[in-house]
A protein has these predicted regions:
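Flexible "arm" and connector segments at domain edges
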Residues: 1-64, 68-108
Length: 108
């Protein structure tokens, strides 16, 4: 699946199951909530915080998919072709950061 197809799948899902998109501000709040859930898992599973018993069954992939779903919703409702935007951003980052990380002593 590419990003364009993912955007279409989300749009179809919203039309068939979600009635309509939440407004952009609501979706931004939803995105913040979902990113917080990802952060909680990472902080407790891979960071220094102790993992609570109730967090041990949390699925990081599922939470990342929640983040992606809301990002795709925001792109759809603001008429952004995320496939195109991502490709442009990757090109910018490649030109800008071509040697940057290779010369970073902290990464060696």
């Amino acid at each position: 699946m590419n990003i364009e197809n993912a955007q279409k799948q989300v749009d179809d899902w919203i039309k068939n199951h979600g009635v309509r998109y939440f407004n952009e501000l609501t979706n931004m709040a939803q995105l913040t909530e979902e990113v917080g859930e990802v952060a909680r898992i990472i902080a407790r599973r891979y960071g220094e915080q102790s993992e609570k018993e109730s967090d041990k069954n949390k699925d990081l992939g599922e939470e990342l998919a929640d983040v992606l779903f809301v990002v795709l919703c925001l792109a759809n409702q603001t008429d952004i072709d995320l496939q195109d935007a991502f490709e442009k951003k990757l090109e910018i980052k490649t030109k800008r950061d071509h040697d940057r990380h290779h010369n970073n002593k902290k990464l060696k």
